[in-house]
Amino acid sequence: MTVKPEQAQPKPNAKSDILFIACGALAKETKAIIDRYGWSVELKALPAVYHMTPLKITTNLDVMLEKLKGQYERIIVVYGECGAAGIDAVLDRHEVVRVKGPHCYEMYAGADQFGRLMNDEPGTFFLTDWLLRAYEKAVLRGLGLDKHPELAPLYFSHYRRLVYLSQAPTEILIKKAQTI
């Protein structure tokens, strides 16, 4: 489901005038919402691993939006701010909107619940289904902890609590979350 920005060209007879561009970490849930409500919406997703280098989010969104210019009546971006400085400026330049929220954790928990979680413990590390499934690649290898486990305290010492925001929990994901 994820595409490279240069592959973003829609089919010549696109079935929808509306496109959602989602983060790969939100694509499965975005597709489920589209299907649940029977929306006539096309969905494209950028790789979730771009979060490891957030500049890739803004750069690749910009490239994708430029390639798709004039192809859709409306484009909605399903991304938070995600540490990607300038994402809103890119979207403004292309006259595109995004869903509200600083990151997917707030989208999954809801603004009120997320606010309570952060007020209760600002040092909270959040896990999602995607992050659990990709933990080894995105966190351990992505942060170099597979080769330098001694760096873990530098990355995680300020976290005091872990919250798993499950979208479609399985016994395997729950057990994995409990081991982290």
Please tell me what each predicted stretch does:
Residues 2-37:
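N-terminal basic/disordered segments at the start of proteins
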Residues 19, 74-76, 161:
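Structural motif
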Residues 21-28, 50-51, 76-88, 102-105, ...:
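Gly/Ser/Thr-rich loops at beta-strand to alpha-helix junctions
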Residues 30-36, 87-92, 174-180:
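Short, aromatic/basic amphipathic alpha-helical patches
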Residues 40-57:
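A short beta-strand-loop structural module common to alpha/beta enzyme folds
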Residues 59-71:
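Short, well-structured alpha-helical segments in soluble
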Residues 86-137:
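Long, charge-dense
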Residues 119-178:
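A conserved mid-domain beta-alpha-beta active-site/ligand-binding segment of alpha/beta enzyme cores
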